[in-house]
Amino acid sequence: MKNIYQIQNLQHHYNGHPALDIDSFSIQPGTITGIIGPNGSGKSTLLKMLAFIDKPRKGNILFKGESAEPFAENVRFQTTLLSQEPYLMKRSVFKNISYGLELRRDTHDLPNRVNDALSLVGLPGNDFFHRKWYELSGGEAQRVALASRLILKPEVLLLDEPTASIDAASAQIIKDTVLLAQNKWGTTLVIASHDWEWLYDICEHVAHLFRGRFFGTGRQNFIFGPWWEPAPGKWVKKLQDGQSLEVPCPPSKDAIAIINPENMLLSTDKKACTIQGTVTRLVLEKHTREIIIIVQAANQAITARLSPKNAHRYTLHPGQKIRLSYLLEDVTWY
């Protein structure tokens, strides 16, 4: 199957500061891809380029195997971006939602199509058609912005923190609606979000972006420096509660340590490093049926994984204090 996106040797910077540096990255059509990373990691910049709003300084982004320029005809009506802060034009809800179709000169049965788009995001057309942009709450504005994109039935819907600054009810509607678009029309979804558990639950692929580079996929424990050497040959990260998270010698003091959740064990192996924390969440992973354990150890979140056959050996619940162990040899570096 041909990739809908193929990134090749992409580099971008702002005022001399590197923003993105991606050698290769691809997305297949009809899939859901999650992008996770801290603020300033380059997520928003990347989504703007995948929407063909901005152009990288170097490298190529192929769309369905072909080069594309910002706002070019072969991508203009096929990709659309929903940003964290929705931009609505200074006009009625109806005019905001119908605008894209009017640009396409595709205006047949417009009232019913606008009403259907509003229904998808849980807003009644009779109540909202004539409302002005300034009469909407934050959650309503985000839902109207999403409806204005869904009415186009896009091939690709890119979402940048779509639920970060709205009420819980609107956030859930948006989550449900974008999945409906993917199921109903085969829309390719690319989602940047701090809601890691939502992404892990719905995405075929989750990629981690840091300082403009992809450095891992799937559930991993990423532990950021700086690292401290309290004794010769012993390297640790000091946590806020006084615990030390031990690692092998890092390649640099700001290197990122990576530990696979499968190597975080509920045991007290005397040869292993240990860390104590509180269970904050238990998640049943749909694809593997494994139990995902989210543990908070002071200021560090840690993920462990239990296979179905081992899950019955433990009685776990949120709020419970547990001790996790790992081996130094299981720590890798980025």
PLM feature spans:
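The feature captures the beta-strand-to-loop junction immediately N-terminal to the Walker
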Residues: 36-38
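Helix-to-loop junction immediately C-terminal to a conserved catalytic motif
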Residues: 51
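ABC ATPase NBD coupling module
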Residues: 67-80, 91, 103
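Conserved ABC ATPase "signature" region
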Residues: 109-127
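Conserved ABC ATPase signature
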Residues: 132-136, 140
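Catalytic Walker B motif of ABC-type/P-loop ATPase nucleotide-binding domains
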Residues: 157-161
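Non-catalytic connector elements of ABC transporters
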Residues: 237-334
